[in-house]
Amino acid sequence: ASRWAQSARVGSILRAFGPGEKKLADPEADWFFFGGDMSSLPAISVNLEALKASAKGYAVISVPHETDKQSLLHPAGIQLIWVIDSAITKPSLALTEKIRSLKWLEGVPYPWFAGEFEGMRDMRRFFRDEMKIDRKNMYLSCYWKTGTPDEGMKKAKVLDALLDVKNFAAAL
């Protein structure tokens, strides 16, 4: 954007695009499992506010400092858990270990996780492979990848998806 601004002239057109569409959890799930780092905090917040008042489950959010915690509107049945992790700029197991340690509730959950690439991959293995949640009944996304600019992260995401499909097909 700064290069464009330096060469912009009166009448130049600027096109700005925001994030994609909202990725809301299935409201019909028996319970919910939200997880992510600070990059996913706005999306988790939107999801929590969209839930029915009777919703139950967990929202586990990793932030680097105690002062980064925020007041989030959420149903009383959703336990809000903050993981303080100063290693937020590199892959960290603190968030995913906390998620794995929580009690699995009764019924069919809807896992929703977004954040760093390696954390997303770990949560995909946990929810899909270990807990046997069908991929259509969860949302997983990486918003960033440690040490990689946006284009590199996008390439890693595509390659990961291709390898995941290949591994899935080989397992059939």
What residue spans do the PLM features occupy?
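Extended, composition-driven regions rather than compact fold-specific motifs
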Residues: A1-L172
